[in-house]
Amino acid sequence: MFSRTDLEAREAATLCPYATLSRDTRGREYPEAESATRTAFQKDRDRVLHTTAFRRLEAKTQVFLNVSYSGHADHYRTRLTHTLEVQQVARSVALNLGLNETLAETIALTHDLGHPPFGHAGERVLNALMHDHGGFNHNTQARRIVTHLESRYPDFPGLNLTLDTLDGLNKHDRAGIGHASLEAQLVDAADALAYTAHDLDDGLRSGLITPAQLQELPLWRELLARVPGTPAPLTSRERRILHRELLGWLIRDLTQASAQAIAQSGVQTAAEARAYPERLMTYSGAMRDLLRSAGTFLREHLYRHWRVEMQVEQAERVLTTLFRAYTARPSLLPPAASARAEHSGLPRAVCDHIAGMTDRYALETHAAITPPGAPTSWPH
């Protein structure tokens, strides 16, 4: 059986000198005994996996409402499947670059915990509703979840994750990215990779994006050139082949460009990598241009598609009604949320409660507090 010190020694012997080592962790906010058989980052990862917030990601929107499209929503990606895909990419690239795989996957598993129901539409609604109370941001909410809202241990609030993991969440918000660990930078890059590839795939699967529209996209045209003989119209088999090729292409570019950037930077330690003024986990210049145009394409043809915009309208109606109902009648809140209101104030407690809901639970709660014949609006 390997002890924690054995695992730490293995890291030191096999990882590159600029990787973040578990034995060099900056510790936790609340001192506690470390595991005898797990590294500090393995312990972080396991704590995140067992949270309620992580389980709820299964029923939260990525792009398509989790309960929409006549039952076909089961085939589209959710926040959970997106998170697992980011984890896989981050771990794979970390392995190839000699970075700390466990820290990278822990940050990846944690980075989307703060998303509310209804995806980015829900985030915009909550941010507007909380305008006078500090706003709402899913990255900030993820940190709030792991430091305060998940109550699983008697000796401290939250999960008491290492400061290294928590800093990875800060850096996912892009503030001061030059001072992030390479593992945190990697998760940020893997997130962009995953949602670009997978949103294109889901857009095609749903029919909201057509192959004809994709001909406008430089990324797609170059992808087709890499898979000669692709038929038109696309079959489901060919779509899967193209998706697999796109993922592999993006991962190879990220790995190779990052390795080159690290070598050219001359960094020799994790501290030097954090202090380096430029992002070292990066894509080639050509790929950055392709991804930038892909983001513009997705905004125009998928995220602003009228069927997706209908979800935005639904999110606004449901979340606004819930927020006003809870703030007008705090007795509607469950006991745990009511208790938080004493410390963080009613608006923030209401926001925390709503942000933790799944799509389905938000819809069911909305229906319960606005039954047929009841008033459809609550006091502002």
UniProtKB/Swiss-Prot annotation:
SMART domains: HDc (SM00471). InterPro entries: dGTPase, dGTPase-like, dNTPase_2, HD/PDEase_dom, HD_domain, PHydrolase_assoc_dom. HAMAP family: dGTPase_type2. Pfam families: HD, HD_assoc. The keyword Hydrolase applies. It comes from Deinococcus deserti (strain DSM 17065 / CIP 109153 / LMG 22923 / VCD115). GO terms for molecular function: dGTPase activity. Residues 79-196 form the HD domain. This is Deoxyguanosinetriphosphate triphosphohydrolase-like protein. Keywords: Hydrolase. Belongs to the dGTPase family. Type 2 subfamily. It comes from the Bacteria. GO terms for biological process: dGTP catabolic process. The keyword Flavoprotein does not apply.
